Design a protein with these regions (language model features):
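Pyridoxal 5′-phosphate
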Residues: 1-178
Length: 178
């Protein structure tokens, strides 16, 4: 829930992590090597102040919503609602182990033998629904699933999605598949 490129590093005491980049630190600006003390040892160049502020705001937001588990529960609820609706649509192929509780809010599917990019485009053009079609950087998975030609359409439900949006997606898929 923060800007891309922000994060943290937890290192156990006694572990030596060598700097991967060298550059000014603002503390020892004329030294060619990184300082030995932490955290400046790993902070070459200018710190990403905007990213750090954004990450802090993201963490505050997570806390205000009741924590990561509360957010994940909402997202899983949306995915389960979506699955319950699309399972009833003829021609929808779902990919995943759905005999267990939904572990993430990502659902991958296909509509008949239509190429995933065509489905994704139709969802965006007709209903304003953004999905991710294709191979998702997982060619071996697609070989195992037999979806190399078609790819899959990936729905990713997030905290700001609503039940109404899920219902719209189900209706849209019904229109496309029926």
């Amino acid at each position: 829930m923060g800007p891309q490129g922000t994060g943290g590093l937890a290192v156990a005491e006694g572990i030596d992590v060598a700097p991967w980049a060298m550059g000014g630190t603002g503390v020892h600006s004329f030294d060619e090597l990184q300082p030995l003390e932490w955290p400046t040892r790993l902070e070459a160049g200018t710190l990403n102040g905007h990213g750090i502020a954004g990450l802090s705001t993201g963490l505050d937001f997570i806390e205000a919503q009741g924590g990561v588990e509360a957010i994940a529960a909402h997202e899983r609820s949306l995915a389960e609602r979506f699955l319950a609706g699309v399972r009833e649509i003829p021609g929808i192929a779902l990919y995943g182990a759905f005999d267990q509780p939904v572990r993430s809010a990502i659902v991958s599917l296909n509509v008949a033998d239509i190429v995933s990019a065509e489905i994704s485009d139709a969802l965006m053009q007709g209903w304003g629904i953004a999905t991710r079609p294709g191979a998702h950087c997982a060619p071996l998975m697609h070989r195992a699933l037999g979806t190399e030609r078609q790819g899959v359409v990936r729905f990713s439900f997030g905290y700001f999605n609503t039940d109404e949006e899920v219902d719209t997606a189900i209706d849209a898929l019904c229109d496309l598949a029926c």
